[in-house]
């Protein structure tokens, strides 16, 4: 009985994966003056002139800042802080566990 249920779930999963893969791998193609066909998913960017391409890349704001590229620069010099929230007052990964026999902490019982 359990094997039949696993087989049905496996086939159902396979059908869902096949359907979603079929939807993502279909590309609409366009041909440009006998230069061959290319997909419409951003592959035309290299065919544009450099000024237009540069402006589109600058408008996307997906670049590394000059401050991050400086030599010998640590993004956050505060010890124990995350690089992403360096200015906040909280520690990035605070230690919250207590002392126990498992962690081999020294206890003074007297």
From Swiss-Prot:
Task: Please verify whether the record's keywords include Cytoplasm.
Answer: no
Q: Does the keyword Secreted apply?
A: yes
Residues under site feature: Required for proteolytic cleavage? 54-55
Q: How is it modified after translation?
A: Proteolytically cleaved, probably by S1P, a subtilisin-like serine protease (subtilase).
This protein's UniProt keywords: Disulfide bond, Hormone, Secreted, Signal
Propeptide found at 24-58
A Gene Ontology molecular function term for this protein is: hormone activity
Judging by the UniProt lineage, the source's domain of life is Eukaryota
Annotated Gene Ontology cellular components are: apoplast; pollen tube
Disulfide links within the chain: 76-86, 99-105
Q: Name one GO biological process term.
A: cell-cell signaling
What is one Pfam family matched by this protein? RALF
Q: What is its main location?
A: secreted
Which residues are the signal sequence here? 1-23
Q: Which InterPro entries match?
A: RALF
UniProt subcellular location = Secreted
**UniProt similarity note:** Belongs to the plant rapid alkalinization factor (RALF) family.
Quote the function comment for this protein. Answer: Cell signaling peptide that may regulate plant stress, growth, and development. Mediates a rapid alkalinization of extracellular space by mediating a transient increase in the cytoplasmic Ca(2+) concentration leading to a calcium-dependent signaling events through a cell surface receptor and a concomitant activation of some intracellular mitogen-activated protein kinases.
Q: What is this protein called?
A: Protein RALF-like 19
Q: Which organism is it from?
A: Arabidopsis thaliana
According to the entry, what is the taxonomic lineage of the organism? Eukaryota, Viridiplantae, Streptophyta, Embryophyta, Tracheophyta
Gene name, please? RALFL19
